[in-house]
C-alpha cells in the first residue's frame, strides 16, 4: 500500500506577530481517488476563473479568494481524508524554538511528524488502513526554503516514528509502532501553481487557521 500525502501550511512561524501556525493537507490510499480529486479541484477552479477578480491571478491561493469561494473549494475535499496540525506559537518555549533557523526548522518538522502520525493512527482506528500492511509513504509539501539534507532527515525521522517503538523520557512509557511494516518515506517539495492538490491543501490549512483565529474548531470540517 502507498499513502499519498499532500500538505501545505498557513501562517508565518513567528510568535511575535502570529498566534497560530498550521500544517494541513490530504491523505490518499488510492491513486485513482487522488487523481479524481485533483481533476475535480481543477474543474472548479476553471469556473471560478470566470470572475474578473481572479482572471489575472497566477493561481487561486486561499489568501486571494473571497470567503464563499474558499468554502466552495474546501467542500471539494469533504469526502477525502483531511488532517491538520495546529501550533499555538505563544505557548512554545520561544527562547529555545526560535533561537535560530535550525531550531525553528527542527520544531516545524517535529510538529508535522507528530501531526501526521496522529492522523495515520486515526485512519487505523477507523479501519481505513491496517496496522500490519507493508506501506510506502509519498509526501509532497508546498515548496519552502529547506536544505537538501533537511528533506532527507524529515523522511528518515517520519520513518523512525512510524516504524519503531517510541519511548517517552517524560512519561516513562513505551509506545508500539504505528505502521511497523513501513518500508519507505519519501519527502519532496513542489510548487502549488503546478500541483492542484497542494492548492487544495492550502485551502484546508487556511480554513483551519481561520477557525482557530475567528471561529470554532468544531466548525472546521463543516
Question: What are the language-model segments listed below?
Answer:
Residues 1-222:
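Phosphate-ester processing/binding pockets and catalytic centers
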